[in-house]
């Protein structure tokens, strides 16, 4: 595939056009896939025709390879790994993937230490693949400009990511006890947003979990409820928001339809209509999403 040197500027966004060997012209764009979202394993993939990042590797390598093959993607085209935090459902395969494919792993120093100590990560990250990032300090990695930001959660450390690429913005906020002031800005600047809607408080309180675990989930460093997620969207989403995906739903304390309806109801109370003002979907826990074109 050859890059045409001419760049077309429209609405102040640079679009790079490609021509393949069949003479077909295609627009370079960002795409998104979720390979799993929940306590069974999390992994999110952002990619263009020439670059890519994988955020979290809590899904098994064999499973990831199968998903890549099913979507006609090359596993060898993964270029960078970013990690949100050191819980097993986000990092259990990060060492294996980094070692087997010689991939750099970006996260905070504390998360790197947590990964090193995590017994669930059987193969550790080689020192030359360890890349330390700082919260609120943007970095340029290939075609991506990425800003990590602090996320309150009871892990060693935790970050979300605000990604800028190909003229669009994408934000990931997961495993979050409460929405911080810094997140307000990133939600407001997002064209595409993945945000946690972990549980129904009613289902959690009536469920079989021991009280200490309920308190942990409901605490300021636990997980975001459906209601809190809906309130964050209603309060801070801007007209530039195009698509929202609800992520990390609890299998025991939530249902996809309940999460979506709860968020939709809160949005309607503020005059925001899902499906009209922006698209709203729920990411599946154990199976991949479709491929989304972020334009």
Which residues are covered by each model-predicted region?
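Metallo-beta-lactamase
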Residues: 109-159, 165-167
